């Protein structure tokens, strides 16, 4: 980080009504595949990952509000860093039915993968013993690759717990989306939103995610692929 930059800290009032959340771009690279298996029809791998992060801004979010979105404030100089950790990767099936009904297929597809990533992480708590807070996620909006990784440098075991119980996590995720009563295309905090989302809970599509999860749980087969040129990472 440039040496001439600095952070100025000021004390805020006790009743300050906001908290901040960073806006990030991330890119995963598989360093080593430790093991692979099929979860239903989905090929899933447990890997050593190199995660590159760029913090380009933050949002102010009002305390107590249900929708975890806020006003964006961009940094003049983004902060970049990287680390090695462990995680899983799988290739989500395309939500072809919802895409066919959409006026913007590219947005609908990418937003479906992003929402699926959110739901699998947040929905894993009851399956893995409460490790979702220790996990990060990246969905690649063109290829449909979804990475879920340990937030701790070197790994923490959280993603391995998810890898071992992945079928149950996928079934649980499908029911979370299907049974949520909200009618919003993007979903809501009960289904697709994440309080840790690095994209301000944008690029989310509830119905696209539901089709993806239904296809997975119905046994549709996919194999791992390489990222494609122009893949848009969403976190």
Q: Where are the predicted features?
A:
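Extended alpha-helical interface modules used as scaffolds for assembling large macromolecular complexes
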Residues: 225-235
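Short cysteine clusters
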Residues: 187-191
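Extended Lys/Arg-rich polyanion-binding regions
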Residues: 1-183, 194-211, 219-223, 227
């Amino acid at each position: 980080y440039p040496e001439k930059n600095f952070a100025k800290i000021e004390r805020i009032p006790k009743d300050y009504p906001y908290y901040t959340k960073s806006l990030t771009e991330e890119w995963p690279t598989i360093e080593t595949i430790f093991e692979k298996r099929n979860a239903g029809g989905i090929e899933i791998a447990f890997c050593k990952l190199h995660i590159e992060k760029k913090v380009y801004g933050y949002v102010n979010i009002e305390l107590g509000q249900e929708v975890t979105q806020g006003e964006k404030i961009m940094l003049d100089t983004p902060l970049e860093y990287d680390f090695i950790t462990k995680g899983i990767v799988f290739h989500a099936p395309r939500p072809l039915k919802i895409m066919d009904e959409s006026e913007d297929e590219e947005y609908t597809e990418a937003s479906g993968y992003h929402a699926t990533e959110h739901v699998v992480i947040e929905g894993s708590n009851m399956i893995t013993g409460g490790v979702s807070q220790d996990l990060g996620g990246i969905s690649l909006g063109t290829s449909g690759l979804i990475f879920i990784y340990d937030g701790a440098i070197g790994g923490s075991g959280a993603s391995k717990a998810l890898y071992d119980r992945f079928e149950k996590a996928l079934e649980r995720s499908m029911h979370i989306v299907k049974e949520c009563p909200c009618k919003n295309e993007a979903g809501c905090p009960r289904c697709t939103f994440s309080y840790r989302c690095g994209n301000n809970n944008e690029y989310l599509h509830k119905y696209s995610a539901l089709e993806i999860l239904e296809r997975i749980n119905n046994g549709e087969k996919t194999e791992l692929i390489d990222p494609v040129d122009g893949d848009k990472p969403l976190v």
